[in-house]
Amino acid sequence: MVPCWNHGNITRSKAEELLSRTGKDGSFLVRASESISRAYALCVLYRNCVYTYRILPNEDDKFTVQASEGVSMRFFTKLDQLIEFYKKENMGLVTHLQYPVPLEEEDTGDDPEEDTVESVVSPPELPPRNIPLTASSCEAKEVPFSNENPRATETSRPSLSETLFQRLQSMDTSGLPEEHLKAIQDYLSTQLAQDSEFVKTGSSSLPHLKKLTTLLCKELYGEVIRTLPSLESLQRLFDQQLSPGLRPRPQVPGEANPINMVSKLSQLTSLLSSIEDKVKALLHEGPESPHRPSLIPPVTFEVKAESLGIPQKMQLKVDVESGKLIIKKSKDGSEDKFYSHKKILQLIKSQKFLNKLVILVETEKEKILRKEYVFADSKKREGFCQLLQQMKNKHSEQPEPDMITIFIGTWNMGNAPPPKKITSWFLSKGQGKTRDDSADYIPHDIYVIGTQEDPLSEKEWLEILKHSLQEITSVTFKTVAIHTLWNIRIVVLAKPEHENRISHICTDNVKTGIANTLGNKGAVGVSFMFNGTSLGFVNSHLTSGSEKKLRRNQNYMNILRFLALGDKKLSPFNITHRFTHLFWFGDLNYRVDLPTWEAETIIQKIKQQQYADLLSHDQLLTERREQKVFLHFEEEEITFAPTYRFERLTRDKYAYTKQKATGMKYNLPSWCDRVLWKSYPLVHVVCQSYGSTSDIMTSDHSPVFATFEAGVTSQFVSKNGPGTVDSQGQIEFLRCYATLKTKSQTKFYLEFHSSCLESFVKSQEGENEEGSEGELVVKFGETLPKLKPIISDPEYLLDQHILISIKSSDSDESYGEGCIALRLEATETQLPIYTPLTHHGELTGHFQGEIKLQTSQGKTREKLYDFVKTERDESSGPKTLKSLTSHDPMKQWEVTSRAPPCSGSSITEIINPNYMGVGPFGPPMPLHVKQTLSPDQQPTAWSYDQPPKDSPLGPCRGESPPTPPGQPPISPKKFLPSTANRGLPPRTQESRPSDLGKNAGDTLPQEDLPLTKPEMFENPLYGSLSSFPKPAPRKDQESPKMPRKEPPPCPEPGILSPSIVLTKAQEADRGEGPGKQVPAPRLRSFTCSSSAEGRAAGGDKSQGKPKTPVSSQAPVPAKRPIKPSRSEINQQTPPTPTPRPPLPVKSPAVLHLQHSKGRDYRDNTELPHHGKHRPEEGPPGPLGRTAMQ
């Protein structure tokens, strides 16, 4: 029996929780050590603090408590003896052991899995084992059994060793070598019992069995090592894709242990199968040239381009192969203009209008033209951008890519073979966020396919996948990895040209069924390096059943903890920190948590596509919101129907009932099949599609697809020699401290890990201080070591990340891990940093301080993913671009007021939405237009604080609420408080908290804006925006005849209050310096009682002064407005007519339209203050319609 105080592989935080519940000094438990294999940790509670002592085994498998130098060590043959000894007083511990904390009773009330053995009782979750579970190893806790329980009589049966000896004697062993037979007998007689002890204590190690198998396989391993090179040479001989000059990498034979043996045998069988396939393909198809290009036919898009307010239809033809963008006025007409790929500088997506795109092109006279087009829908625009990116990539002069596209697919096949045609899955066609037809011919760089309940063999499934991809892309993809656990499988395929860019391939699996061995649930994973970027992929099948949510959560934690992928040097970090990009997908089995009697109501909502109502009850979204699973992961918005449980061979009916022996079982329609991802901070990743197919119906699940753009780095070679002065880079952390949620009484130190460091760096111990709410604050001050990167070129160093682990000095166990990006907008400057700390998937605290980065001289080249940017215009409506939510704000830095003033911008200064808070980037403008700051655009310091991300979960995660009832969805005006806020993280454009701006209920009309250059479209009611007369004096511009002002984007909590920004803008309006503040007058004639419409940004407390909005485009030259005195402002009364400011030059048609309807608008009774004068030519302020609602 395992003692009640032995808790096996529970986490440190769980141990602290159990001890804290008892509240008694001397309470104790033993758990497995997280830092040393086969070691244990003795945890003792004393005065509400947890003290941890390490229990180490020696070479003779005797146990001792690690002690300080000079203290004599006591050894014990069993853990029980050690615990009994330290129950005595004054034995060296902080207090003697008194109250053992028993194991928690596991919830066994749920029905067993449909496909598992019901008669087996499920013990606590343990790590994967290397041998089948025996009866003795199942006894995980002391439970009183009745006489009817057959296990109660196990003590009267022969021992396991005797039983196996009898079995060995009955076997024919005449063919066994004598030394092998003797080794087996020795193992059964003495060593089996010792291995059994390891199993009982929850260890996954069986050292004596490994020694036995190593001895038995010694000669076989040598033969395999000698045979493999010959087979590999034969395989390369028939490989059509391999370059002739490529030489195989030398392989160093590893140790002849069972793990290496299994790996080599698997490699041997795979090679034999591969050689046969390659010879067949070569004889059938003949040799083909390596890196055969895929031909993408020209694609034509019908768009609208507006001129003087009149839309004109045009044709944009993208010829990827020739590298041209052709512009035609009619589909069958001659070419009007064309631009080569070198002349196309940038694509700028409108954030508010999802079908609008700006193209920046360079003319022959080296001028920059800004061309605006409106596509039929957002999918067409996205397809156009992908084709242009493909063109840029195809004709790029860079030897290595800096962005790749990844396809992720997950499908529970329901133990049924697939249909003949599954290409819609790989084309991302069906429901949800799908790809446009124009992108069909663009192959992804990497395809990752995860299946569950897969009835096919690996060879059969691989042939189907490759054939389907070749049918739609004309590319023969290379197999990177394939790994199977029971019926859970993951396949990774890559383009042939990427074969030599992929290295360090690793596969692993974790069982999460009954006792971690029985059943069919678990996970398989693959990881590899793509040049300098680490990628990880996990396909999991979690426990089924709507009521088993907690067990699913535990499945996730076990996979997270025990899946061994990636760089083994990153031992303190689990898979969520080991990869630049980690993708987790599969049949996660989280359900819609509603009563069974609402089944028909659910189906009706699905038919009406009311997914938001159902997603508010989605278990996975709820658990993520409460930070119980998938902490800091991302998921694209779900806009497709639930993928489970359908009647087979149709997608029109959900089969939500199933008759079982125990009664009727309900499986309400749910989104069981999901794709989530987690990337390092400030790394480019955009989800381009997320949906499910509608035509693959052999299973009760529908396949789910997701596609991503992901930034990658190359294997960088420094241009500077190691001896040059400017190559000495340095990373310095200053005034750093960690806040931990722990009751442990120990000292802490930091470890810094990174691929840019030669090896990890360890710091000195920090100073502990008591924090608020029982937290512990560990301050490191100026004692942290200065890190020396191996390469200091900024092109390399700014793409790197530093992984931080805070560890206990006593046990060397990690208490939290975090990640810091080195992509800083300024070097040689101290900048604030922040990262949350997590451990085993739980939030354990945070780390913050300052960083100073020193690089060598050099420039960073523009990345391919910078070619497509998102213009930060006004906050968009309900359908914002989801690419802007591709980073968790918890991963960003809390940086306050560090945006330097910006007086102008260039083409490359448009912020990438995935590089939130990086520098003072702003929107582009033609280079031949001189840029000047207007008084409304004085530089303002913005905060880069990133708040914890809770809001993005749910049906409308990260998006702004719908447009208020009285607010028109479209306005031709843009608003930008200042130039400096161009560095504001785009996420602030997506969230408009309802509590912001409540004191700014007064809706302020505003004047026409003569300072703007042509915007995305023109409206005749507002006049043409094509000319730029000089601005009117400020005194005249403040007259109450201006049209309604659009509400500016409201930042999330944690961002600098917009009231601060607007105050500074007001100071600029009055011509005052920032140090001299003038109170703004309250113009009551513009006060509006509507609280839901037209609020000024973020709570403008002055509430009175109407301000001229500044276009999100860069301003044109303008004279400084006349500064009115306070008396002049106060003398302005709305009923008194005031001189009108000069209006922009308008076309005759526009003037006629305004003159003919001006008085009707002026006299309209819907105006909020129809007693006030308005000029006839002025357009009606939209405020008039909203104030009455």
UniProtKB/Swiss-Prot annotation:
Motif SH3-binding 3, residue range(s) on this chain: 1040-1051
Which residues does the annotated region (Disordered) include? 103-132, 870-906, 922-1189
**Compositional bias of type Pro residues: which residue ranges?**
961-971, 1134-1145
Q: Which UniProt keywords apply?
A: Apoptosis, Cell membrane, Cytoplasm, Cytoskeleton, Hydrolase, Immunity, Lipid metabolism, Membrane, Phosphoprotein, Repeat, SH2 domain, SH3-binding
In what ranges is there compositional bias, type Basic and acidic residues? 1033-1047, 1157-1177
Write the Enzyme Commission number(s) for this entry.
3.1.3.86, 3.1.3.56, 3.1.3.36
Substitution effect: V685E: In one patient with acute myeloid leukemya; somatic mutation
Reaction equation(s) it catalyzes: a 1,2-diacyl-sn-glycero-3-phospho-(1D-myo-inositol-3,4,5-trisphosphate) + H2O = a 1,2-diacyl-sn-glycero-3-phospho-(1D-myo-inositol-3,4-bisphosphate) + phosphate; 1D-myo-inositol 1,3,4,5-tetrakisphosphate + H2O = 1D-myo-inositol 1,3,4-trisphosphate + phosphate; a 1,2-diacyl-sn-glycero-3-phospho-(1D-myo-inositol-4,5-bisphosphate) + H2O = a 1,2-diacyl-sn-glycero-3-phospho-(1D-myo-inositol 4-phosphate) + phosphate
Q: What is this protein called?
A: Phosphatidylinositol 3,4,5-trisphosphate 5-phosphatase 1
**Lineage of the species this protein comes from:** Eukaryota, Metazoa, Chordata, Craniata, Vertebrata
